[in-house]
Amino acid sequence: MMLLVTSCSLLDTRTPESPSNTVQYDPAFDYQTVLVNLRKSIQYKDPAGYVRCLSDTTDLNATQYMFEPNIEVLTRFSGLFTKWTITQERAYFQNILSKIPTDLSCDLQLVNTIYDGITPDSVIIQSDYILTLPHTIASIPQVSSGGLRFVVKRQNNGLWSIQRWSDFLHVNDSIGETWSSIKAQFYN
């Protein structure tokens, strides 16, 4: 009896497949890495990376995430932010990304950044920002700016994340559109 075995080069190496997500994030073992990862998630349009920067509201051991919009947006979109969680963060971010052409770049610039109240497990980060999201909705500006205040805490797993996010409109802001406004307008 003769056995004939054929194969398609079992011992040959195959061409590796490209990964679906090529963004490399460092584990946030310090609070500065949270900012680096946040900027990367926006630059590379990565919702999963974006929400990883926020305190995981679904983890009962984690400090609950809270977003505080600037007062003008809070008044204009009454009730929208009362129970804002990382689920809403993901929804707004995915929604806006669906309206940005794939060949256009997003950008988050953080300037005048101050680290305050540094302890072994928390820090307050204040910064001015310019956020560029080149979406296709003509009635909504593509650039927003303002000030932010993050309370960043170390979670039980040793990783740092944003536990509280406050957004502010600067008095002399020439753009007049804050990140809060972008979140509100792209949530639905």
PLM region spans:
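Short, well-ordered alpha-helical segments enriched in acidic and aromatic residues
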Residues: 45-70
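Surface-exposed, charged secondary-structure patches
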Residues: 72-141
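Acidic/histidine-rich, surface-exposed loop or edge segments in extracytoplasmic proteins
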Residues: 14-22, 35, 63-78
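Short, low-complexity N-terminal intrinsically disordered segments enriched in polar/charged residues
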Residues: 8-44, 52
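Short beta-strand edge/turn micro-motifs at domain boundaries
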Residues: 9-21, 122-124, 128-188
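Extracytoplasmic/secreted proteins, especially bacterial periplasmic and envelope-associated proteins
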Residues: 30-33, 37, 49, 84, ...
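Sec-dependent bacterial lipoprotein signal peptides
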Residues: 1-8
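Sec-exported extracytoplasmic/periplasmic mature domains
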Residues: 43, 55-59, 94-102
